[in-house]
Amino acid sequence: MTDLIKLDAATLAAKIAAREVSATEVTQACLDQIAATDAEYHAFLHVAGDQALAAAATVDKAIHEATAAGERLPSPLAGVPLALKDVFTTTDMPTTCGSKILEGWTSPYDATVTAKLRAAGIPILGKTNMDEFAMGSSTENSAYGPTRNPWNVDCVPGGSGGGSAAALAAFQAPLAIGSDTGGSIRQPAALTATVGVKPTYGTVSRYGLIACASSLDQGGPCARTVLDTALLHQVIAGHDPRDSTSVNAAVPDVVGAARAGARGDLKGVRIGVVKQLRSGEGYQPGVLASFTAAVEQLTALGAEVSEVDCPHFDHSLAAYYLILPSEVSSNLAKFDGMRYGLRVGDDGTTSAEEVMAMTRAAGFGAEVKRRIMIGTYALSAGYYDAYYNQAQKVRTLIARDLDEAYRSVDVLVSPATPSTAFRLGEKVDDPLAMYLFDLCTLPLNLAGHCGMSVPSGLSADDNLPVGLQIMAPALADDRLYRVGAAYEAARGPLPTAL
């Protein structure tokens, strides 16, 4: 393993821009690390070495020409390679969503996020492993096998975006993209000592992000430092007329906020500790101790810390696991074997309805089928008002809790997860235990607000990573970066997985 791959993205970008190292060299170093380690971690579903090297060569040429002409580079991250979660469409490599039903399928169009990455001169190393259609908290629901946590290969890396987080922790990539439906960026970040951000809903385009639950899904940036995450956030955010839920608002200056925060002054910043997310069944002592230490550190930086009550958070899990399956049952109806993807039983003797049934039975995994059935039940005529409508009312109350909290504080904090990474297979047969792992993260998806997980050290219980979750109101993503960068700087360097 070369020292090059251990550098943060901002440093790599500066070296590439100064032509101290080429984008091709950096990309090749990452590809070499993937080749050397991914048999153990299985972070990637598809490695696009040729395409990544071609993109890197194009960037090197552009930098040479821009330098000669005194022009600007394509972006502040030009030439820095990236791992892309396999839920974003790409025209030059498969998009499977971790499902057999899309095995081998290549999209005819790029997602907006993919297109922005290409325009910014960021080589895409490949597509990372994930829970099937982003349904899961461990990446064990992937049809192509689980991803292993580089900190302990007997443990999960979190989910649904465990592949992207593991790729960062294993130094296979300095940058990654994930999607967050109930914590799928923040939770894996916490378990792998990386940084992950769920932006405000609607501020990063969902065009080409294959939907799990449309009102909850949000693409976002992942990296090993807060500044790197901010730089990537700036690249992918912005209004997109092709996404009907896209917010036409200015992107907050997240990079400026991260740089300001790194100076370590939080005087006047009001931080609320969410009462409902700091204790209870399932919280490990080591996680709570790490959280308490993080809050003390924030106080030492000058922040004004108080406890905040969000009473309806106690009902967020129940509401989420009615709303999400309901949207899943609708969104996944399109995967029927008729137009693209897997087709089973089409031998000339079966009807279209039979082919659809056989295709879906063979193509979807157990967790996807479970959520489709729950959602269909919740949306049925006899139960729509009793279940789905009630869940939406609770969702409104959760959003009101947050709005009320932000009248007295600027950001909220909590543990990112109740425990550190659990062992592979430990919760696979217990869906409720798996769902409870999202307890700290999913309220923000219900409200559409933004959140970050930043590493807060290693748990004294098992020496595995712990994450601090920072939350902010909609369109105040810059607050996450100011507080996160200040905490990161005060916390100091942490051990790495490798």
Curated annotation (Swiss-Prot):
Its EC number is 6.3.5.7. The keyword Signal does not apply. PROSITE patterns: AMIDASES (PS00571). Gene3D superfamilies: Amidase signature (AS) domain (3.90.1300.10). GO terms for molecular function: ATP binding; glutaminyl-tRNA synthase (glutamine-hydrolyzing) activity. Keywords: ATP-binding, Ligase, Nucleotide-binding, Protein biosynthesis. It catalyses: L-glutamyl-tRNA(Gln) + L-glutamine + ATP + H2O = L-glutaminyl-tRNA(Gln) + L-glutamate + ADP + phosphate + H(+). The keyword Nucleotide-binding applies. One of its GO terms (cellular component) is glutamyl-tRNA(Gln) amidotransferase complex. GO terms for biological process: translation. Pfam families: Amidase. PANTHER family: GLUTAMYL-TRNA(GLN) AMIDOTRANSFERASE SUBUNIT A (PTHR11895:SF151), TRANSAMIDASE (PTHR11895). Allows the formation of correctly charged Gln-tRNA(Gln) through the transamidation of misacylated Glu-tRNA(Gln) in organisms which lack glutaminyl-tRNA synthetase. The reaction takes place in the presence of glutamine and ATP through an activated gamma-phospho-Glu-tRNA(Gln). Heterotrimer of A, B and C subunits. This is Glutamyl-tRNA(Gln) amidotransferase subunit A. It comes from Mycolicibacterium vanbaalenii (strain DSM 7251 / JCM 13017 / BCRC 16820 / KCTC 9966 / NRRL B-24157 / PYR-1) (Mycobacterium vanbaalenii). The gene is gatA.
